[in-house]
Swiss-Prot record:
Entry-linked PANTHER family: MATRIX GLA PROTEIN (PTHR10109:SF0)
GO molecular function, one term: calcium ion binding
Keyword Nucleotide-binding: no
Disulfide links within the chain: C49-C55
Modified residues (Phosphoserine): S2, S3, S5
Keyword Secreted assigned: yes
Naturally occurring in which organism (per UniProt): Galeorhinus galeus
Location of the protein in the cell: Secreted
Gene Ontology terms: cellular component: extracellular matrix; extracellular region
Keyword field: Chondrogenesis, Developmental protein, Differentiation, Disulfide bond, Gamma-carboxyglutamic acid, Osteogenesis, Phosphoprotein, Secreted
Gene from which this protein is expressed: mgp
The protein's name in its UniProt record: Matrix Gla protein
Length: 102
């Protein structure tokens, strides 16, 4: 009985090479496939605006670029009150010698 159970386990187990041989068939690269996999930034922008109803309505009136900018534009998020940044004049400068003239 124990020898039969070992045979079944051997049949069910596939090595990594054997599994990859039938799971992924090699094919030549096709530039049309990459268009389906990766969306352009404009397409991602359009989809994000379509999902938010006010942005979609405004996009019909003034255009996608302006509508997206109004609702999802580059707005700085406010830091949390617990980790407030010091005022700019007291922050460490990235370029410490910026005040010297050469």
């Amino acid at each position: 009985d124990s020898s039969e159970s070992n045979e079944i386990e051997d049949v069910l187990f596939l090595g990594r090479q054997d599994a990859n041989s039938f799971m992924r068939q090699p094919r030549p690269p096709n530039h049309w496939d990459s268009r389906d996999r990766f969306k352009s930034p404009r397409e991602r922008t359009r989809e994000k605006c379509e999902e938010y109803r006010p942005c979609e309505r405004l996009a019909r009136q003034v255009g996608l670029k302006r509508a997206y900018g109004k609702y999802f534009g580059n707005r700085r998020q406010r830091p949390s009150t617990s980790g407030r940044l010091r005022p700019r004049k007291y922050r460490a400068s990235r370029y410490r010698n910026h005040h010297y003239r050469y």
